[in-house]
Amino acid sequence: MSAPNERQTDSMHNAQSLRDRLNAAGMMIVPGAYDAVGARLIEQAGFPAAYMTGAGTAAARGFPDFGLLTMSEMVENAAVMARSISIPLIADADTGYGNELNVTRTVREYESQGIAAIHIEDQVSPKRCGHLDGKEVVSRDAFVSKIRAA
C-alpha cells in the first residue's frame, strides 16, 4: 500500500477533527449545501463542519432524490466541496451504492477525496427520498453487514 496522498491526509485530519468535535459536550450544528459556494458560505459563517446533501445534489442536477446519481457523480461533487473548505465535510453516500463490496469501495472513494465522514441509508434500492413516505428498508442483518464493510 502506498503512502497517503494530500487529500487522504486532509481526510484523516478532518475525520479526527470531526470525531473530536462529536465527542465534545454539547450539540454540533452542521448546515447542508450542494455545491462549493454553499460549503464556503457555511465555513465563512463559522460552522464547525459542512454537510453535502444528496437531495440537494440531485436536485441541482435536475433529478429527484431516488438514487439516480452514481457514486462517481456524488464523490466528484463532494470532492469539489471538500477542496473549497478547510472544515470537515460530511457527505451523503445514499445506500452505499450496492452490497458490502460496493460499500467498501464507496468509503475508499470518498476518503480518497478528503471527505471526513459519510452516512449511508438503510433503504432498499432503488431508494426514495428520505423525506417522502413509502420507503422500504433492508433487513437489520443486511444493514449491519454494510456497516461492518464500511
Stretch-by-stretch model annotation:
Residues 2-32, 36-45, 149:
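N-terminal amphipathic alpha-helix/helix-capping segment at the start of soluble metabolic enzymes
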Residues 13-16, 63-91, 113, 131-150:
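Alpha-helix-loop-beta-strand connector modules within alpha/beta enzyme cores
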Residues 17, 37, 76-77, 105:
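Short Gly/charged-rich anion-binding patches and loops
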Residues 27, 39, 48, 80-83, ...:
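Short helix-loop boundary/capping segments at the starts of domains
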Residues 29-35, 50-52, 89-93, 118-120:
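Hydrophobic faces of well-ordered beta-strands that scaffold small-molecule active sites
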Residues 38-41, 97-109:
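Catalytic cores of alpha/beta
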Residues 46, 114:
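Conserved functional loop/turn residues at catalytic and ligand-binding sites
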Residues 49-75, 95-100, 119-141:
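Glycine-rich, proline-tolerant flexible connector loops at the mouths of alpha/beta enzymes
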